[in-house]
């Protein structure tokens, strides 16, 4: 959804800026087990403010026809698009277009909209393109470039999605950098030292042949007191490098009140470091801008009532035959009955006896027995 909103259409993108290939090649999104095309639905609700007098709860829905899995030649089209602000519907786009309550964003409307409401609505209907979002095209151009910018800026700067965090690399650029100089960022370096780096410090070095700064481990030679830098991926652990790459995004989320969505959050990073980050998000004295952290994990250690409320813990159960995934919360089980979930229970032990679902028995023994049998027969 983020990639679609930022480019303003449901066509494929030539720019592979995300490690998630489905963000650029939308034919990868539909369920690969479906024989016929089914609508793909996206929905998001978030809060944004523009000064003390303009605070908004923004709800956006998008329903699209992308064809079947890997169907590149399918004629794609937008089936529905809805924008609501503070509970009021601003527009609804289906086969037709309804412009509804614009008063909720009256301070953001263009002058031409207020003066020529009827004619502007007709122009907007005629501007619809089945592959282009009305939000970032007709609505932006005709009704409110300022409010559209508010939404797009939120998607750009405050909705941070890290796909495949295990392979993430942070690219640093500096204005007018000096070649071979070492740039040490104090906050990141202090966090890295708490995490447990093997060197004296970590910093970024710009080489002669590459514009992007690379992460280096910094040492002081105890004999001659000179500073030496070695590429961090040679000296530091995989988990340390992952932590250093991710930590600036945690800082950005806290500073902006953004949403940080992380795939494979716990890969190669010590659970105590991750729990400290989680506790920072829960700390109202530190998280004054109400930033959010959303992550997936295979590690049941996070099934902990001291870390998360029951409604904050979600499970995903995938059907082996249909490949459909069902998302549900721990709080959906209620607090009574055989499967009721009470505060301060041992969620992890209950999960391992399949009380909450989203777990399957895996036994590789038959595979190895077959290998041994083949070796004996050979």
PLM features: residue spans?
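Switch/communication elements of ASCE P-loop NTPase nucleotide-binding domains
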Residues: 1-9, 216-357
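Conserved P-loop NTP-binding catalytic core
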Residues: 1-57
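Electropositive, glycine-dotted interaction segments
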Residues: 50-202
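Short, ordered beta-strand-loop transition motifs
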Residues: 31-38, 205-213, 319-320
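Extended helical coiled-coil dimerization/tether regions that scaffold
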Residues: 162-235, 355-362, 366, 371-378
